[in-house]
Amino acid sequence: VPKIESIRPGGTLEASFSAYPLAELLLGILRGNLTGRLDLFLHPEPRNVVFFKDGVPVSVQLPDAGVSLAKILIDSGRVPHEQGLDLLRMAEASGRSEEQVIQQHNVLSPGVLDEARRRRARAQLVRLFDASPLDFRFQEGVALPAGVPLTILQPLPLVYEGLVKTQDRTVVNRFLEAHARSTFDLAPTFPRGVDPFEWGPQVERVVTQLPPPLSVARLAQAGLPQEVALAAITSLHLASMLELREQGPGVRPLAAVAPPARPPPP
């Protein structure tokens, strides 16, 4: 599959996440500073789409990704548990979206609803890290239609969270097979003084303050869980924020701890 960065103006790339994992696709779109439309074939109708502008997701519309807005509001404490379940039941009974029901009953301020949309959009994209057989199509140059709700997300935190949570080991296995025992230095492209991947204070402190060189083993020895250490190093490597210090041998691939989630049948 050709790299998304090499797409021609107005061009189209069609593939599946098994051939072109979502982590690599998101970073390729970011690296290429691309604007366009990403269709995800979760449903026979063309209704699951992500719009990008200058490499960044700016509108996420994935009704078939299986993430409930009402449950996000419950989990974040924005609505009481029973009220949230009532909203969910009303949406299911009426055939409307949860968002339409919430807006009709005017239970949230616009700011709270916007934040819930962003949380849902992030959760939807992270969930797709396990949808390895899923087909997609990216069309370069397609602009965001007027009136479409904005859900602007940063790609680097999406990649890190997706690598931590996914059961599909494709991306981390590629790294392990090549660099499991390699050592690295942070590249000058890594922005010091910020947390570009939204690792959180503990991970950010270990990665940036641990005396070089960096490796999966050294991050784990410094107290990070193995899956967090692996996701942090892999995301840095994918984002071209590591410089190889010493090439070490790879290891055998990890097996998935659970079968990857598959999209619903048409």
Q: Where are the regions a protein language model picked out?
A:
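Acidic, Ser/Thr/Pro-enriched low-complexity segments and adjacent helix/loop capping patches
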Residues: 1-266
